[in-house]
Amino acid sequence: ESQGENASVFVANKLAYFLQRLGERSFSRLKFTAQSYGPYSPGVAHVLHALNGKYLTGMEQMEAKPFEPLTLQYAAAKEVSEYVKTRLRPEQRDRLRMLITLTDGFLSTLSLEILASVDYIRKEYPQISKEETISRIGTWTERKKELFKEQYIITAYDHLEKYATRIGDMI
């Protein structure tokens, strides 16, 4: 939950996608494919279902729609923070910090979708230009063609470009 945006299956998918792209091995089994709202893995819903009850609510029946709000259980925040500090390896904590930096400025659902979609295209076509990326976004879905303004795509492309050397094989 950030800047008025709710936690959701959609947001969890985008964060898991970027953690995987940043090299998080515990997410290596998630298979992301190009779907209506960008890269998506059905496995993320299973992870959320496993966390349901103690860390969040809204995934009781695993029927939450992509943008349906999930409620984070803030009473567990201290436990989660302690887990991150004591149980994650330093490189995993570094990935979390990089995820925060990478998504800074892209926290709305639309901007997360744009960032992840542009990255997915760049991953699939490593030498793709900005112009070709804009064109591919336009053929992904009619919704993306209408919603993703050229400037939004360029902003995401340039943002990802800044991280290309720091993130390694992410881009």
Model-derived features: where do they sit?
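Domain-edge interaction signal
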Residues: 1-171
